[in-house]
């Protein structure tokens, strides 16, 4: 049986908090925009209180490490550090936001090829592709790169087979171009899929010392 896990994500505009306790999952989400610091700790308190779980019962802290906004990723890692130090848990689990969204695609649609296109600014997007193997592991099928819109469009047109699209960058391209892609409308990570990944495979249970986690930012502020 898995231990009690507190998982959260603030890498994009939504604050997402999840709890696994006695094999039951709980989840709350809220649109936070750039106010993650105002919402994250109260939401953690809320999910624990509603489910009658004390902070001291938490065995594992898990969060996303990006790619995401500079402030959002930093806030999540800072809160993870604060809670883990308070509970004397020197290690945390950190997962890519793309893996979290890919796992949601698999859970909801059973599509094993996932393309992430995330807006960086008005003229460029973050691009990466993952494929799920028979063991439930997500394997990179491309490098993570920043592309201008014309180059990204070229890559979309060259895609073979069906890919599920996640991220908020799809609206930068003509809808008729995207017909060969399954648009999932998954534009941000839901932290309950952090717990799904951890539960599914020991590969995703790897814990790290916080200062060794390398965050991935989509911008510099």
Curated annotation (Swiss-Prot):
One GO cellular component, as annotated: cytosol
Keywords, ordered alphabetically: Cytoplasm, tRNA processing
Main location group: cytoplasm
Coiled coil: none
GO biological process per UniProt: tRNA threonylcarbamoyladenosine modification
Location in the cell: Cytoplasm
Listed InterPro entries: ATPase_NBD, Gcp-like_dom, T6A_TsaB
Described function: Required for the formation of a threonylcarbamoyl group on adenosine at position 37 (t(6)A37) in tRNAs that read codons beginning with adenine. Is involved in the transfer of the threonylcarbamoyl moiety of threonylcarbamoyl-AMP (TC-AMP) to the N6 group of A37, together with TsaD and TsaE; this reaction does not require ATP in vitro. TsaB seems to play an indirect role in the t(6)A biosynthesis pathway, possibly in regulating the core enzymatic function of TsaD.
Protein name per UniProt: tRNA threonylcarbamoyladenosine biosynthesis protein TsaB
